[in-house]
């Protein structure tokens, strides 16, 4: 049979308060780790160092690279250039953009100089 000192109301109250404090601390600690994981980050992928939006290029790649590849051969005859520009009007647009240096929609003598 337990002694009277072990079951006194003061000891029971202390045990109850101690249990409540332990449970409250455990709940606060669990909530803190859970909220730490749910914090919205400005750069969520920075933790993994994964590139974002730097993948393979699709068909949206500009055709100016094709024009540069064409001109990198350094020597293209007029007939070759005409044939290529007739087949690919997008390249013709790129040539016009290159010639129109001030982007006013007109090719002037100042643009050609």
UniProtKB/Swiss-Prot annotation:
What InterPro entries does the record point to? Answer: EF_Hand_1_Ca_BS, EF_hand_dom
Single Gene Ontology MF annotation: calcium ion binding
Q: What is its main location?
A: secreted
Cleaved propeptide residues: 58-113
Q: Which domain of life is it from?
A: Eukaryota
Keyword Aminoacyl-tRNA synthetase appears in the UniProt entry? no
| PTM sites of type Phenylalanine amide | 54
Which body tissues produce this protein?
Seems to be specific to the mechanosensory neurons of the central nervous system.
List keywords of the entry alphabetically: Amidation, Calcium, Cleavage on pair of basic residues, Metal-binding, Secreted, Signal
Compartmental location: Secreted
Q: What does this protein do?
A: May function as an inhibitory cotransmitter acting in conjunction with the fast excitatory transmitter released by sensory neurons. The peptide selectively inhibits certain postsynaptic cells probably by means of sensorin A release.
What is the name attached to this protein's record? Answer: Sensorin-A
Q: What is the native source organism of this protein? A: Aplysia californica
Q: Which gene encodes it?
A: PSC1
